[in-house]
Amino acid sequence: MSKGYLYIANGRVVTKDQEDSLEPFRTTSFEAPCMWAADQLGMKLYMGINRTYASELKCMDYDITFYNQHIYRSIFDIKTIKIGYQNLCRFLEAHPDISVVHCNTPIGGVLGRICGKKYGKKVIYMAHGFHFYKGAPLLNRTLFKFIEKWMAHKTDCLITINQEDYEAAQRFKLYKGGKVYKVNGVGVNLNSFNGVSVNVKEKRESLDLPENAVVGIVVGDLNNNKNVETIIRALPLADGNIHIIICGFGPLESTLKKLAKDLGVDERCHFLGFRTDVKELYLASDIFIFASQREGLPRSTMEAMLAGLPCVVSKIRGNIDLIDENKGGSLFPPKDFDSLAKELTILADNPSLRVKYGTYNKERIKDYDIEVVKKQMLNIYQEVF
């Protein structure tokens, strides 16, 4: 009988209709390399998802047995966490063939390790960005760091996706014989822009962008962490031809729109909301701008590199792993809008430099090809299993 492999991670809160849906499940890029590697080793695949009738669902990619994990993002919803714990315990009891639990994200990572060791399983934990990091608030640097150090004792294999986390994890004491690894995130499909074409002039006209505008694209939720405020504050100080298109929505949307108006740059800030044509928008832009305060290995930066854009990004974990300064773009302290404005102006005034940086990034991102990550995961699994 094949050994069982269980994959779990936090999930988003969804609508009742989505939760009760019987639509077949398709794996995402988040778990794709892991499921592929386990399948290559002949493991029987199990996966936790937040769907009421999970056990009845079929998977479009692999032969996976699902269960309703009831694991969400909130670290303060004790009732929900308790249900997630109980559901996981019941599932492990009902499937003694499971020998490996691969857990991800804060809540999934804690529950997976506690329950995994409770039932004598090999435990793999993949950290997609520790909540303690350089420049983090005191709570993160104390409570969250303590939790990770404590949970490391229940971890056979700890996988990180950036250099800062890799170095931090090496200072943890893992379960006997445990080991720390680093992989290149969850990978990107190098062919994802194949077949994507755009008439730049028409696309820009549809967005009411001036013909001579230097277009910076901003992608992400409009929340405190993504720090779009710093980008808007940089605009009055930057080259007047720079316009930004902001793809995303969130709780700070109205606040950011008011800020743009108060600073007199509302006509240069184009709030586009949720978009299904983000790849086309990358190709119609000149510069990628990202001011986030905390990331693991940001997918938006990786996609911008794939699109051949120069990247002006915050000097934080993840970004510094991806962007080589003065080769693929530039880095700035997350709250320093003066520095950001200067970097944007330099690129706005130098089209050839934009091309040079973008060309470099298209080559650099090849290290993060999903096929590379699949092989990294397979090598780790072969060691651990």
Question: What positions do the PLM features span?
Answer:
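N-terminal strand-loop element at the rim of the active site
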Residues: Y7-T80, E164-K173, K179-V180, P251
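A conserved mid-protein helix/loop that constitutes part of the nucleotide-sugar donor-binding site
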Residues: S21-P33, V214-L237, P251-K258, M302, ...
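Donor nucleotide-sugar binding/catalytic pocket of nucleotide-sugar-dependent glycosyltransferases
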Residues: Y67-N68, K149, H153-N199
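Short His-centered aromatic/hydrophobic patch
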Residues: C103-G109, A127
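A short, well-ordered alpha-helix in the C-terminal region of glycosyltransferases
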Residues: E205, S339, I346, L353-D367, ...
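Aromatic "clamp/platform" in nucleotide-sugar-dependent glycosyltransferases that forms part
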Residues: F274, Q293
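Short hydrophobic beta-strand element within catalytic cores of glycosyltransferases
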Residues: P310-V313, I323
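Conserved acidic donor-binding segment of nucleotide-sugar-dependent glycosyltransferases
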Residues: E325-N326, S330-F337, I346-P351
